């Protein structure tokens, strides 16, 4: 196998791992955001509207992370800087 094939194969494996980690991180983030919101609503029900607004703001910020990782992953796949 030549060096080009090895680099392409290693990049494909690495990008798959990166995509999996980004998905797992996003799922954990959603779980933490949701659990803390429910916990806050349980403690102070009158704060429900403010907590929900904050939840959706932080959830939107947290969801941007996998899309940024997706862009970097596709950059490594299709415009691989390691191939020269």
From Swiss-Prot:
CDD domains from the UniProt entry: ATP-synt_Fo_c_ATPE
Q: Name one GO cellular component term.
A: proton-transporting two-sector ATPase complex, proton-transporting domain
Q: PROSITE patterns annotated for this entry?
A: ATPASE_C
Among SUPFAM superfamilies, the record links this protein to: F1F0 ATP synthase subunit C
Location in or out of the cell = Cell inner membrane
Q: Name one GO molecular function term.
A: lipid binding
**Site annotation Reversibly protonated during proton transport: residues:** 63
- What does the UniProt keyword field contain? ATP synthesis, Cell inner membrane, Cell membrane, CF(0), Hydrogen ion transport, Ion transport, Lipid-binding, Membrane, Transmembrane, Transmembrane helix, Transport
InterPro entries, A to Z:
ATP_synth_csu_bac/chlpt, ATP_synth_F0_csu, ATP_synth_F0_csu_DDCD_BS, ATP_synth_F0_csu_sf, ATPase_proteolipid_c-like_dom, F/V-ATP_Csub_sf
Q: Name the predominant localization.
A: membrane
Look up and give the membrane topology term.
Multi-pass membrane protein
Chain segments annotated as transmembrane: 13-33, 56-76
Q: Which Gene3D superfamilies match?
A: F1F0 ATP synthase subunit C (1.20.20.10)
**Keyword Zinc attached:** no
Origin, by domain of life?
Bacteria
State the NCBIfam families in the record. Answer: ATP_synt_c, PRK06876.1
This molecule's function is given as: F(1)F(0) ATP synthase produces ATP from ADP in the presence of a proton or sodium gradient. F-type ATPases consist of two structural domains, F(1) containing the extramembraneous catalytic core and F(0) containing the membrane proton channel, linked together by a central stalk and a peripheral stalk. During catalysis, ATP synthesis in the catalytic domain of F(1) is coupled via a rotary mechanism of the central stalk subunits to proton translocation.
Please state which protein family the record places this protein in: Belongs to the ATPase C chain family.
> What quaternary arrangement does the UniProt entry report?
F-type ATPases have 2 components, F(1) - the catalytic core - and F(0) - the membrane proton channel. F(1) has five subunits: alpha(3), beta(3), gamma(1), delta(1), epsilon(1). F(0) has three main subunits: a(1), b(2) and c(10-14). The alpha and beta chains form an alternating ring which encloses part of the gamma chain. F(1) is attached to F(0) by a central stalk formed by the gamma and epsilon chains, while a peripheral stalk is formed by the delta and b chains.
Q: What is this protein called?
A: ATP synthase subunit c
Give the species: Acidithiobacillus ferrooxidans (strain ATCC 23270 / DSM 14882 / CIP 104768 / NCIMB 8455) (Ferrobacillus ferrooxidans (strain ATCC 23270))
Q: What is the lineage of its organism?
A: Bacteria, Pseudomonadati, Pseudomonadota, Acidithiobacillia, Acidithiobacillales
The coding gene here is: atpE
């Amino acid at each position: 196998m030549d060096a080009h094939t090895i680099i392409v194969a290693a990049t494909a494996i690495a990008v798959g791992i990166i995509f999996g980690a980004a998905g797992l991180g996003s799922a954990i983030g959603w779980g933490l955001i949701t659990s803390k919101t429910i916990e806050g609503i349980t403690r102070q029900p009158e704060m429900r509207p403010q907590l929900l607004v904050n939840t959706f703001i932080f959830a939107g910020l947290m969801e941007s992370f996998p899309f940024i990782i997706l862009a970097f992953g596709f950059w490594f796949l299709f415009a691989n800087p390691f191939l020269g």
